[in-house]
Amino acid sequence: MKENNEQKNCLNDQYIIKYIDYIKFEKRLSENTIKSYLNDIEKLYSYSKNYYKFISKDINKYLESLDYLDSRSLAHLITVLRSLYAFLNKEGIISHNPCNDVVMPKLKAKLPNYLTIEEVNKLLDINLVKPNDYRNKAMLELCFATGLRVSELVNLKVSDINFNDCYLRVIGKGKKERIVPIDDIALKYVKMYNDYYRNKLLKNKDSEYLFISSYASKITRQAFFKLIKSECAKKGIEKEISPHTLRHSFASVLLKNGANIRVIQELLGHEDLKTTQIYTHLINEKLKKDYEEYHPRSRKE
């Protein structure tokens, strides 16, 4: 992150430096979130170094100049600006948040891509030969069994797993801790990897992290994403894959099998139920399909 930050002109500004320290140390936002915030703040700073003197009409004029942004990017930018100006207001640097009256663009719900059970089973069918294979199998099984974010998965420590009581201690967004149960199958492969193959990847080095790369260090998010894409390509799964594909698949399977959405919210570590409710489209699809199949008046002549 440091390398990227040095390229940002906005980090020469004392108020922005204070704000970044605030979201990093007090709000405890993740490194990736801070990077995305900085990208938007850099846009504002490039537009005007007197951003802290802006009133509502200045903000609206600035937003009008960004007509090349799609609605999702614009909504993210407005969220960042509201947060920045709220901080400046709280610190007494400005007397009013000029973003208070800004209207958010309407967003079409972006439905998460997920794998069917058949596709998941294909993905998890890994030929176990090398230590890397056992690690990959353990990671994929665990990810589908728990719905962990990729960042949570790669940051797991051996001490976070309770093999006796079958649960994980997960440190999620904002350093919030949650307990997530693990099923017997995933636990079996994680234990097998940890007991017999992890040390082979460590090559006599020490690490507190559970999943180890071929370079005897903690595996990265990028490496795991590459693994998912590679395995999907091998298995002929042609869907658009993201780092969260297995997380979405986990939530989708639970919902389709009747799990309470509040339980899914807790397992996924979502602070806001609205974030979890995007998965309810799956229930609506199933209801519609069942209605069309079984209701006599839904059948077309």
Predicted regions and their residues:
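Conserved catalytic core of the tyrosine transesterase superfamily
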Residues: M1-E301
